[in-house]
């Protein structure tokens, strides 16, 4: 059809765009470069975003607001990294961590990403069951 699909990244609290790939500025696996005027930093693998488009807070919920807004930075709850060209890559979700009995934190998205590179794997979901990491793989 000749339609090119480009990834972007945004959330409601940030009205809504944080990063976007563009026709001439794109990178495979990335959600794009951070929007003009916006700032991203990574703290403990979590994506933080700062811009005048970020919400002021959650309506009548100062407790949650205080958890996600600190010194003007919005804590997205998403894991990722910026490369040297300022392209943002999403690697997982903070709330998706599997915590094993030995205290080890495992990101299911990292394992899923690796498994998807295997021949014959079309879809995969990684989860915890009985303190073991399990995967359902669909060819």
Describe these PLM feature segments.
Residues 30-36, 44-68, 104-106:
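Conserved ATP/PPi-binding loop(s) of AMP-dependent carboxylate-activating enzymes
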Residues 72:
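A structured beta-alpha segment of the ubiquitous adenosine-cofactor-binding alpha/beta core
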């Amino acid at each position: 059809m000749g339609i090119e699909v480009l990834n972007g990244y945004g959330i409601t609290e940030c009205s809504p765009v944080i990063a976007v790939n563009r026709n001439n500025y794109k990178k495979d696996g990335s959600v794009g470069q951070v929007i003009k005027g916006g700032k991203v930093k990574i703290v403990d693998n979590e994506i933080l975003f700062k811009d005048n488009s970020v919400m002021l807070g959650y309506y009548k919920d100062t407790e949650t607001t205080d958890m996600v807004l600190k010194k003007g930075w919005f804590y997205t709850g998403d894991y990722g990294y910026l490369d040297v060209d300022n392209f943002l890559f999403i690697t997982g979700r903070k709330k998706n961590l599997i915590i094993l009995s030995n205290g080890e934190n495992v990101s299911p998205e990292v394992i899923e990403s690796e498994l998807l590179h295997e021949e014959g794997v079309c879809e995969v979901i990684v989860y915890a069951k009985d303190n073991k990491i399990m995967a359902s793989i669909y060819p």
